Regions:
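Mono-ADP-ribosyltransferase
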Residues: 1-224
Length: 224
């Protein structure tokens, strides 16, 4: 007879899913960087952003070889908060450098490789590194997230290109692959202490992203 899961663990899983799914939206980051997707983004693995990740909610047919599609309920929508014409036109958003993602899918079609990342809370990283967490996510969402995201690329490949999202400045901001350093190596998975010079922008991004829940911080650094 299987041992029942402890109630405390069940509550933690539920809290994690409530951080991930309600309000979850898709964000896009297109790049022509040299990426070994099979090596760097193994389905089921967990990665840390490593730097502030600029993304957009405005995307149609990609003109680049790679597209990161990120499911997140805690992305800072800069275009709604900063009176900057470029940010508004690009629908620019950003994710904190201590954001963690589970690699859900790598899908290639018509020369474009799409990498699906799901934003997860820091304290749940050990659980989401396990094999059975994938089915847990799919079950909790009551839908097939991978199918939805693959269909997104299928549909967008039939659309026109948004001219705004092909501007050189935006593409440069999105060039660096998520979770990789300048040499193409994975950034450390360890939570990075906030350098003093980045504290203000870090706090602003967290606030805009409604990302103050203690579940997304180390216990010694929790924001109540």
């Amino acid at each position: 007879m299987e041992k029942e899961m402890p109630q405390e663990l069940i509550r933690f899983f539920e809290k994690s899913i409530n951080w991930i799914l309600p309000g979850c939206q898709l964000f896009y980051r297109d790049t022509d960087a040299d990426i070994d997707a099979q090596k760097s983004y193994q389905v089921g693995s967990v990665i840390r952003a490593g730097f502030f990740i600029d993304v957009t909610v405005k995307a149609q047919r990609p003109t680049t070889k790679f597209r990161f599609i990120i499911g997140s309920a805690h992305c800072a929508k800069l275009y709604e908060a900063v009176p900057d014409a470029d940010m508004v036109r690009w629908r620019l958003c950003t994710l904190h450098f201590n954001s963690y993602f589970k690699v859900m899918d790598v899908y290639k079609k018509e020369g474009v490789t799409q990498i699906f990342l799901l934003h997860i809370p820091y304290q749940a990283v050990p659980f989401f590194m396990s094999e059975h967490s994938f089915n847990f996510i799919q079950g909790a969402s009551r839908t097939n997230l991978v199918e939805i995201v693959r269909r997104s690329l299928d549909e967008k490949l039939r659309m026109d290109v948004f001219a705004d999202t092909t501007e050189a400045e935006l593409l440069e901001r999105m060039k660096q692959p998520v979770g990789l350093d300048d040499k193409g190596n994975p950034v450390p998975l360890d939570y990075m202490p906030i350098p003093e010079e980045y504290k203000d922008i870090s706090d602003a991004v967290r606030s805009l992203a409604n990302d103050l829940d203690p579940i997304n911080y180390p216990e010694e650094d929790c924001h109540e």
